[in-house]
Amino acid sequence: MQSTKTKTKHFSFLLLITLGVMTAFGPLTIDMYVPSLPKVQGDFGSTTSEIQLTLSFTMIGLALGQFIFGPLSDAFGRKRIAVSILIIFILVSGLSMFVDQLPLFLTLRFIQGLTGGGVIVIAKASAGDKFSGNALAKFLASLMVVNGIITILAPLAGGLALSVATW
């Protein structure tokens, strides 16, 4: 039989991985996408400035998503809101693969950012729900390490994905 301390460590590790992946959704929408910018530009037949707007729209969405979904998760529950926005994120990401008009693509990138920002704020709020004081500080530091590793690997993953498939 596992001790309480072992169960707590196992729970904390699973929570760290889960929330680490959640906090990485926002940066992943940018970092995995960057290697494909020249290909996206060619496919849309757009200027460099127009394609750079896809990053701007995503960043604006990331910022606004935190302001929108933080209070919503406080009011309606973290899990309900997180699951809803993850579903939206996945659907929007799938739709963006089939879009051939830049204005619609910009809209989808904004929604990706919005939902990515929502997941980030919910992940951090969830950590605050589970921990406090020094334990929270240690957990958030570990969360940032996971997020940092994912952020470093994302452009590599994006480049690799681009080498075997299209954007």
Predicted regions and their residues:
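Cytosolic juxtamembrane N-terminal segment immediately preceding the first transmembrane helix
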Residues: M1-G26
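Small-residue-rich transmembrane alpha-helices and their cytosolic helix-loop interfaces
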Residues: T23, L55, M59, L140-G148
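Extracellular/periplasmic helix-loop-helix junction of adjacent transmembrane segments
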Residues: S36-A63
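Helix-loop-helix hairpin linking two adjacent transmembrane segments in secondary transporters
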Residues: L104, S142-W167
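Cytoplasmic helix-loop-helix junction between adjacent transmembrane helices
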Residues: L108-V146
